[in-house]
Amino acid sequence: ADVGAWIIAGKEAKMGVVTDIKQALRAANILRVMYNGTDERMVMRMLPPRSASSPGVNVVADVLAVVPGSAAGEDSSTVRSEIRVRERNVFLVLLNGNGKMMVGTADALELIDPRELTSRVGAFVRNVSDDPGLAEKVVTEFDLPGGGKMEYPVSQGIVSLQTASDTPFDSYLDVQNRIAQAFDDIRTHLAQRQFGKPYVELSDAQRQVVMRAVPLKISEAEPHVSR
């Protein structure tokens, strides 16, 4: 059976405590988790199982579902896979206990206002100018419902999120939602271009095409201890 758990935390909760709960769930092989904060926003994710993966660019990519005020969302078929990723395809998001955020690639991190995060993630993932410092793309052919084909440059980009042990849980949820919004925006653009209507109005078959063309990939490192 697919067993899940809820993590409901108040305004004072810190990511160090949440991580302890996640580790206990992983030890019990309960990997599907719904996070619920103080503002009724929810994020569903699959926890990576404990593994002795090597350091560097080995990451676990989890497809998240952002569920606004509901226990079910359009992306509820969450997917987890362990993959090896080139460094240029990893967009780092570092969030400390004071809410300060640094983003970018490993050799080009910069401090930003969290309100800029959605646009920064979107620019990295889409890489419309084919910048070699941003995410790679692989042109992929998809079968369309009702017949026909679609070619789309699928981004290889992954967002890697790291918090501190004293990062507020609400800040973590806010960042997760801002990251997911970037992918939602790209999906909406593709849906409008390919099917002539917003993503939320697509049929299930059309939505599956868009989700495969624009996969939502986020990896997480365990929170580090703030100094």
Residue ranges and their predicted role:
Residues 1-227:
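Long, low-hydrophobicity, acidic/polar, solvent-exposed interaction domains
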